[in-house]
Each structure stands twice: as C-alpha cells, then as structure tokens.
C-alpha cells in the first residue's frame, strides 16, 4: 500500500495536474508500483546567490563552506546538543519537514524536546518530535519492517532501546510523568514508547543522508 504524503486538500493540486496531463493533453497513464514522488521534494529551490543576498540584507554573519565541511560542522554541533536550522535543496510538498526545511536536534538529549517546544516552536513542552533514521539502521531502533520516507508510519521503539520506569516514576502524574525519559532517544519517544518515523534514503536526499551518517559516526 502506498499512501500519498499530502492526502489532504493540498494534495488535490497534484491530482489536478495529473488530470490535465492525461485527460487534456492525452498523455498515456502508466502505473508505477514504486514511489514515483521520490521524497516529495516538489517545492522551490533557492540559488546560493539569492540566499547570500537575503542574508546580507539582514546583516547576518555567515560563512561559505563545502558540503563536506558543512556536514562535519553541523554533525558536531548536533552532538553537542545544538539546534540546527536545515535548509537545502527543493522544499518538501506536504505536511511534514523531511530534511529540506527542517529543525534538527540530538534525539538522545533529555532536555531537547522541552527546549525546542518552548524556545523554538513556542508550543506545549510535551509535544513530540519525529526521528529521521537511515533506512539501513531503522531495524536496530524500531519495530518497523517497511520504508517510511514521508514520516507517516508509527512504530514501537525496540525493547532493548526502551527504559522501563521505576515504581516511583509510575506514580507520577501529568507533565511530571511525561518528562520521564522512556528510551535512549527520549526527544522522539512518545508516551507509549512509539515514534513517528522518517526513513532517510540516499537516493532521494543524499545530503541529509550524509549528515545523519556523519552524526552517527560521532
């Protein structure tokens, strides 16, 4: 089963484009058993010159780095519990940030979920975040047997990655109980030990794949 990642009203624009392509322009329809959206990166891509001009107009301090340098610096920052604004390539189409316009942080940090919610997203501290994991590593962390490139599937965290609450912690109530670390990746673990997962594939988002791989090595 393949689920359209933008299955709401916004996805109707894709259907309208396809209807025009096939019905008005008389192009033959070909069904594809694979994922033809290839990551759903259908939005605009900004040129470096455009980005530099905008940063300069804001008086922002910035540096130009090679891709290898950029990935190394950002992976190091993430490992030190820094928050990264990740902006690269074409923008995602649909409801989820999938490694093109994303806020990134270390899922192992016990404080990161609260800090991102309160200081960056300006919302309730207990709201969950979702993990991006290399497709070849997903089985080591989650009970998930299928690719989930669009962050649509929820699966339990592996038992050996979970942290069982103590009897005293079980007695806690409300936000105090929600703040208890439930796994080795507490920033992306739901209260029921599940997570909403994005599998990352080098075929569809190579730069994001490289960043996560570098972070893994650190």
Please tell me what each predicted stretch does.
Residues 2-218:
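Flexible beta->alpha loop and helix N-cap segments adjacent to enzyme active/binding sites
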């Amino acid at each position: 089963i393949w689920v359209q990642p933008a299955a709401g009203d916004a996805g109707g624009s894709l259907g309208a484009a396809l209807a025009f392509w096939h019905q008005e322009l008389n192009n033959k329809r070909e069904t594809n058993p694979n994922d033809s959206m290839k990551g759903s990166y259908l939005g605009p891509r900004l040129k470096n010159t455009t980005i530099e001009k905008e940063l300069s107009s804001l008086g922002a301090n910035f540096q130009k780095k090679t891709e290898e340098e950029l990935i190394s610096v950002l992976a190091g920052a993430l490992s030190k519990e820094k928050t990264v604004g990740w902006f690269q390539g074409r923008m995602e189409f649909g409801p989820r940030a999938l490694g093109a316009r994303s806020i990134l942080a270390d899922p192992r940090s016990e404080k990161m979920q609260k800090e991102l919610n309160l200081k960056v997203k300006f919302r309730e501290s207990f709201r969950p975040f979702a993990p991006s994991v290399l497709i070849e590593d997903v089985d080591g962390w989650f009970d998930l047997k299928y690719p989930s490139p669009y962050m649509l599937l929820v699966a339990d965290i592996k038992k050996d990655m979970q942290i069982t609450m103590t009897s005293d912690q079980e007695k806690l109530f409300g936000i105090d109980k929600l703040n208890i670390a439930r796994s080795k990746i507490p920033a992306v673990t739901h209260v029921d030990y599940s997570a909403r997962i994005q599998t990352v594939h080098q075929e569809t988002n190579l730069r994001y794949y490289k960043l996560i791989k570098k972070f893994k090595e650190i």
